[in-house]
Amino acid sequence: MAKFNKDSVGGTILVVLLLSLVCSIIVAGSAVMLKPAQEEQKLLDKQKNILNVAGLLQENTNVKETYAKFIEPRFVDLATGEYTQQADDSQQAIPADADKARIRSRSKTTEVYLVKDEQGQTQQVILPIYGTGLWSVMYGLVSVQPDGNTINGITYYQHGETPGLGGEIENPNWASLFKGKKLFDEQHQPAIRIVKGQAPQDEHSIDGLSGATLTGNGVQGTFNYWFSKDGFGPYLEKLHSGAN
């Protein structure tokens, strides 16, 4: 039998292939083992963001316990504005003239989060929103009071906008400008306005972001879409009337 020569060209190639195979197995195994931990962290981050916009996140908050105690997730059929028992993630194309958020499509249902008090009464409803800014899709949450119109708080938690400019959408000082503003006008049309420079002191206007007009336009488009009849409009109208 011929003796294996690891220093030959064939031997070198074989050693490289074996090492590559071993490394691939290690990497694949690590990915499988880490996936549950990654999914757990993803869920924890989601719960933190929800508690944060609800005003329930403090430095020493037990996220899982607080979320389980005060947050009730519900699925909403966006077309009817009614609660549904099951999620329907099938995508619906958004006509170009209606796609103010520039997201092209959305699922038929979405998850909303009811914020309860100690007696189990709903004090806020948290709605997920997303839309395209200058460089990225911007993901946020809006907390709305039970009247279906008054903003309790907002947060943007994921985006790729320019740090120090469009990235200021995640600045708590800017987010605080939304508190107490009204989502709709008297005709129940989306009424939030991102104003370049200093906004007038009214129920609907928000100061724009300095040096980030296009990101501000993206936020404007996001609110225009998600609080229209094609987004959360029907749901919030039912919430306001007490139908939900």
From Swiss-Prot:
Transmembrane segments: 13-33
Family: Belongs to the NqrC family.
Gene from which this protein is expressed: nqrC
Pfam families (alphabetical): FMN_bind
Assembly behavior: Composed of six subunits; NqrA, NqrB, NqrC, NqrD, NqrE and NqrF.
Predominant location category: membrane
Function statement: NQR complex catalyzes the reduction of ubiquinone-1 to ubiquinol by two successive reactions, coupled with the transport of Na(+) ions from the cytoplasm to the periplasm. NqrA to NqrE are probably involved in the second step, the conversion of ubisemiquinone to ubiquinol.
InterPro entries reported in the protein's UniProt record: FMN-bd, NqrC
GO BP: sodium ion transport
EC number(s) per entry: 7.2.1.1
Name of the molecule in the record: Na(+)-translocating NADH-quinone reductase subunit C
Keywords: Cell inner membrane, Cell membrane, Flavoprotein, FMN, Ion transport, Membrane, NAD, Phosphoprotein, Sodium, Sodium transport, Translocase, Transmembrane, Transmembrane helix, Transport, Ubiquinone
Topology with respect to the bilayer: Single-pass membrane protein
GO cellular component, one term: plasma membrane
